[in-house]
Amino acid sequence: MKHVIIGTAGHIDHGKTTLIRALTGRNTDRWEEEQKRGITIDLGFTWFDLPSGDRAGIIDVPGHEKFINNMVAGVVGMDLVMLVIAADEGVMPQTREHMDILGLLGIQKSIIVLNKCDLVDEEWLELVEEEVREELEGTFLEHAPVMKVSAATGQGLDALVQEIDHMMQDEVEEKDITTIPRLPVDRVFSLSGFGTIITGTLRSEE
């Protein structure tokens, strides 16, 4: 069984956390403040098994501009990113900012997920997809597949899972084990009696 890391990116309230909950059955918003405000503040983590038997770990990143540092921490080391765009709003400021960050970090594999498709009619959906394609032209996302889904109703989720599984069947980029080890930090928090604690994952590729 192969382990891969996938994650989300996109504007606030475009349905990243809801999409992950629909795929995995788990809510990645753990903190009371997140649930009270209905936004993701810190990184969230969960997993699900792909049809091929491989296991996909999922990192849910914040979409709000105030938490962009947490977003950057989350996408480091991902094998695939789902750029989530709400069909009723289209490309928004944090969509573009997250696209720029993903490009700078060298993310190779991405899927464009048009979410909330249940809220718009077919004509509007075509206009949004055209807008997205124009926005992606000339970027590393230009040839990324576009999947139309609704995390609320389940529309298109099976096809999305199949696309993720298909893209992960190719060899993920081999990690360079000859350089100085680097630990992607997932979370930073304070615990009484222990002080500041960081968590992350360091794996041997040998």
Annotate each language-model stretch with its function.
Residues 13, 19, 38, 60, ...:
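Residue-level signature of catalytic and energy-coupling elements of molecular machines
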